[in-house]
């Protein structure tokens, strides 16, 4: 301020060249940064850090996934070798009527003749079933008793000898069952391959 007046001075453009002092400071900061980067590179990655993936956890997860896939593939393999007669049956609910004992359980299927082993879903997903080829199962309404001469009625006709109430021929049953087994075989092969790849990690 001179003679009661303010004087505003505009700062000129900064010098492009660095003075010796500035050049030395920049060199020191660059050296410190390179030292820090080298220290970070040489330092081993901690396996117990919550922010970084633990190698042991990844390995265990891979083994668990591999074991699970192998179990699923084995289950599919068991389903593949199950009798086609079981796969072809579309009546797998508990039997409702026994012509030998005249027992009506009020279910949705009718049992003709001998006792039928009914497929059950176990705790580990294993299917325990064995339906004899000589056993005939037919679908009926749950609120209706079969007459005593039900053997002569179309709804109790053996599907392997002709069209039953569901209208599916034995050849179509066989075709559907074979396609189902083929699809299970493909899925099982893929699961085994993925499990082997995970187990190799």
Curated annotation (Swiss-Prot):
| Gene symbol of the encoding locus | virD3
Q: Segment Disordered: which positions?
A: 28-51, 139-171
Q: Which organism is it from?
A: Rhizobium radiobacter (Agrobacterium tumefaciens)
* Designated name of the protein: Protein VirD3
In this chain, composition skew of type Basic and acidic residues spans 141-161
Species classification: Bacteria, Pseudomonadati, Pseudomonadota, Alphaproteobacteria, Hyphomicrobiales
Miscellaneous note, as given in the UniProt record, is: The Ti plasmid contains at least six transcriptional units, designated vir loci, which are essential for efficient crown-gall tumorigenesis.
What are the UniProt keywords, alphabetically? Crown gall tumor, Plasmid
């Amino acid at each position: 301020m001179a003679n009661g007046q303010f004087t505003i001075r505009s700062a000129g453009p900064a010098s492009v060249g660095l003075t010796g002092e500035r050049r030395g400071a920049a060199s020191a900061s660059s050296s410190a940064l390179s030292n820090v980067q080298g220290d970070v590179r040489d330092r081993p990655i901690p396996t117990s850090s919550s922010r970084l993936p633990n190698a042991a956890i990844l390995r265990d997860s891979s083994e668990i996934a591999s074991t699970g896939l192998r179990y699923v593939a084995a289950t599919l393999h068991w389903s593949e070798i199950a009798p086609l007669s079981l796969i072809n049956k579309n009546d797998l609910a508990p039997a409702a009527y026994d012509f030998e004992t005249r027992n009506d359980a009020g279910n949705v299927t009718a049992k003709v003749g001998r006792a039928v082993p009914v497929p059950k879903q176990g705790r580990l997903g294993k299917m325990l079933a064995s339906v004899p080829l000589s056993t005939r199962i037919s679908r009926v309404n749950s609120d209706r008793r079969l007459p005593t001469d039900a053997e002569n009625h179309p709804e109790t006709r053996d599907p392997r000898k002709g069209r039953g109430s569901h209208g599916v021929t034995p050849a179509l049953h066989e075709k559907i069952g074979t396609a189902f087994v083929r699809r299970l075989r493909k899925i099982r092969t893929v699961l085994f391959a993925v499990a082997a790849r995970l187990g190799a990690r």
